């Protein structure tokens, strides 16, 4: 038996054992990935760290399994498609590889074409690198040799003196060579079966079957996951349809529409002041809603039918085939994965294989031992003398020995060895055939069924994603159109409230503009008055009449006062803005974020949370455009609180949901709009009349003060907009009730307007006195002192300004007015004096008597107190004497303290003089220091500018350096990759040289050097025909094994065990070991200093990028990358890589023309031999055909089988005894040692007429064995011939042969 390894249909070599190309089987690799081929069972183990992306993994798998990258389909356990993130996170350790070509849709149509299946199986065999070849016949089994030996035997027996011409020397040489080749043939068979026959219970073929079925299970799980996706889509479609149908408004929208007809919205037109009424039913299109309802009914009916049809389609095309697929998989498991009950049978088979192999080894040893003493051809043709042609006695004896050896091997050893080899071959081929059978079933049936299921799932998914999804979307759109009828009261209410809020915003903005105008005007007025007063005082106190440039006329005075006093006044531009503002654009409603501060935030959030539906289309756009535009425009411009309140009351009256009514009321309150009872408040004027004060509440739009939230939001934004760098404005709101304050402010404003004329006539004299009361009078004014005086007077100035008055709070204004003139002030004071006098007189009249009684009681109390005081006086006099004495002592001490105080005062005066002197010195020193500080600041600015320039230069240099470092890193990586590829390429070149030598040696040629090599210069190569390569290889292998193992085995075991390595692995040519010396010219020490192994260059580059703003003083130093470059160049020169490369090329180079010429010449000889063998083969086929025809005409008499020609004769047993009274006697086959073969001649087709006949010649068509047991011993049908118990007999059906 021989096994040929075939790649791309070209025989690479002849091997005597199964060869399988496995990359790596080490499962202990870090993050090992086990990759399985789903159709061949092959396995590859690789480390996950060597793959940087999914494309690299696919390229590795494609090269390992000979599958194109675009045809790869990768699955993980449990049927999940492979993602590269699973490998990165080490979530998987197994990958199953499928070829997309076996899942092609075209395979479904060509499923009955066996040619296509055979092509796919042939590709699998090529991919698996296994091709079993049946054991070849022995070289001795040749008819030509048999005839020659018979003739030679006759010559040897009948002739005493044999001449050379009496013997065919060519045939004698052929006989000798055949005996030599026969031992090699037997050794090769034994070596083959020792390596191919497995003695373990788990063989590689069983592992392949298990891997194939496991891959099929993974594929079935993948189909299940795809089906679950389809099932989820189908269930989601049903749920969506059921939800739409349960909440459908097809039958309820009419009632809602009738309710809209009873809900009006009343408002007055601005131009004609005529009340208008708008019913909500005018905002929707009834005909369009009717069409939507009808369309929704039709789609619901069609969708119900469509989903029912899809369900039946899924059950028929997906669910049922999946169940059949699972049954088919279970059948494969029970058929090819042997259960544990077969363990005994499996053990028995292993024992049989061992027994057959042991017998084969014994007979091969006998054959090799018998062939060990074969004579040479010269010993067979030696003559008696040099001049004689008669063979010598020794030659005749050798020829007789040769013929005897031939007969012994040809008759006894070779047939038995060949039979044992065929038995082992059958056992081994059955294992491979089981896998091939499973592959055929998978390709012909299972994979095609899986492809059909996937195709059906894709088609059904397309229907669900397109037709069903589109219809459900249409139903949803129609339902949204119908939902507008129920949502319209809320939507319209929110819209009109928003228009009302816009109106309020305009009023609020107008109030803020007016207030800002007043403030700006007041500031201008106060500044002009201050300038006039200052100019007057300056001219009066500085002696302006003595200086010519201060002689100012009226025009110069006015220019000084009014220069740079520009008027900043805000004006309303409502008309211009309304003309230039673009028309509003309708945008679809979108969800509003909760963090958005906008007055429509609550509205949008409310609309989006009503029912969870997207914004419906504005149905109102389908109404007549002119009428709708006029109505909506008038409504937006003339909206009022009263109209909205009336609308809300109408909704409540018509029974609209209270949630809608409450939401509208909440929206109204959120806008700061009140619509409750209006509080009337009256105040009395100076003239005695009573008026009603509403404050700033314009038409119930709000109070526009601190209690109005909406107004305060806008007012705070306005005030906060004045913030700038270093200035923060904090707004504190007074929580007092502002209604009464507003009424009071209204009264003050009326009084202010009455007093304006009086104030203007007196030219604001009181104001000037008040503003200038804190200003120094007799100082020389200059711009610096003027600014200082302004700053010192700032609190006083701010006392009477509106912006800085402490009494002014937000929403309330109080102004303290000075008296208009002295007369009015005197008159007011006299009135207050008279009022106080009257009060004093009234108090005197009512309190005289009470005062008298009180005084009497006090006198009595005083008398009692005097008596007690007299007693105490005596005690005090004594005490006084003592105190006088102590007083004198204190007086003396006091004088001393006075003296000490005078001394301290003098010291204080001296200290004050010293402090004054030091202060003057400190002032001078401070000026000097200030000058130095100014100079240093200028210097600092210059240095900062220089620093910024240096930072920019440093940044640019760092960027360039980082780019260069990156380029050097890339060059390092390229060098590293180039070294690795050069090393790999060197190995491939050396392997090619080894393959060339092995190829030449396999055809009997040897590559040698004619001249010896010296001083790294190879000698001349030549190819010679050499005999004895087998023995030479055997010697080399034995020598290497003895070197490694230290012991030698017997020759027989050595020849049988290592013959494969001697033929395929051992190279006899001395050119290969000579070239191997120069194989490692790429010294790996050059790569010891790579980018990733030294000095942290990436960190250095990153550090430079992060600190690019600083001045890097290490730019002038030599970087670590530069050091590594120099070290790499030094290593390159020291290791002499160039010389090694040249030596490697010289000693690995083989001339192509030399090889081609010698191989072509050798193959010409082989082709000549092949033609001769083919001619012999044709002749043997013809002889075999003649012998077969001759054998078919001979009658068999033992070991009957179907197709044999048999002679049937009547038995001597009476018919009635055998057949129970039948008319016919039984017929039996003529035999020698094979009894009980009876003819079965049943009536019908093939019946033979046996009457009046003594014999019958027929060809056996069927043999049916029977056995007589105790149960059927008396049965006429089971034992018609009354044979003894336990006798085995046979029913033979035959066809009569007449010619």
Swiss-Prot record:
It is a peripheral membrane protein. Keywords: Autophagy, Coiled coil, Membrane, Protein transport, Transport, Vacuole. The keyword Cytoplasm does not apply. It is found in: Preautophagosomal structure membrane; Vacuole membrane. GO terms for cellular component: Atg1/ULK1 kinase complex; phagophore assembly site membrane; vacuolar membrane. The keyword Transport applies. One of its GO terms (biological process) is reticulophagy. GO terms for molecular function: molecular adaptor activity; protein kinase binding. InterPro entries: ATG11 (IPR040040), Atg11_C (IPR019460). Involved in cytoplasm to vacuole transport (Cvt), pexophagy, mitophagy and nucleophagy. Recruits mitochondria for their selective degradation via autophagy (mitophagy) during starvation. Works as scaffold proteins that recruit ATG proteins to the pre-autophagosome (PAS), the site of vesicle/autophagosome formation. Required for the Cvt vesicles completion. Belongs to the ATG11 family. This is Autophagy-related protein 11. It comes from Pichia angusta. The gene is ATG11.
